[in-house]
Amino acid sequence: MRVLLQLGLLALGAVCVCAIPKQSATLRALVRETLTLLSTHRTLLKGNETLRISVPAHKNHQLCIEEIFQGIDTLKNQTTQGEALATLFQNLSLIKKHIDLQKQKCGEERRRVKQFLDYLQEFLAVINTEWTIEG
């Protein structure tokens, strides 16, 4: 019985480990497809020259996610939808859902100071290496 339980836990762990890269690979594939669709249909999307959409002033895209998706909604509502554009906006919606699910993890449980400091150090390292620091 104990061996069966251990095998079950081992199988569950293997499923979890395999699911994470698959989800990440799926998201990467979705983003690549969306970039291709955006590039392909850019002219069609630019059709409404009078439409104005807010564009964040700085390049730290992580800080402007809400503004980016508000712009996507504006563009979607003001653009004549065809099948190709429907796929583009559907992909963008799926990407937003993924980001929203990830944001829910921000309010995790309280932990010890050392764990917070480790997280803070990692956060600052990301800012230092991946973000465009503006003056």
UniProtKB/Swiss-Prot annotation:
Cellular component terms (Gene Ontology): extracellular space
Superkingdom per UniProt: Eukaryota
Glycan attachment sites: 48, 77, 91
Keywords: Cytokine, Disulfide bond, Glycoprotein, Growth factor, Secreted, Signal
Annotated compartments: Secreted
Main location: secreted
Disulfide bond in keyword set: yes
Pfam families: IL5
Annotated InterPro entries: 4_helix_cytokine-like_core, IL-5
GO MF, any single term: cytokine activity
One BP annotation, GO: positive regulation of podosome assembly
Signal peptide location: 1-19
Record's subunit section: Homodimer; disulfide-linked. Interacts with IL5RA. Interacts with CSF2RB.
Purpose: Homodimeric cytokine expressed predominantly by T-lymphocytes and NK cells that plays an important role in the survival, differentiation, and chemotaxis of eosinophils. Also acts on activated and resting B-cells to induce immunoglobulin production, growth, and differentiation. Mechanistically, exerts its biological effects through a receptor composed of IL5RA subunit and the cytokine receptor common subunit beta/CSF2RB.
Assigned protein family: Belongs to the IL-5 family.
Record-given protein name: Interleukin-5
Organism whose genome encodes this protein: Cavia porcellus (Guinea pig)
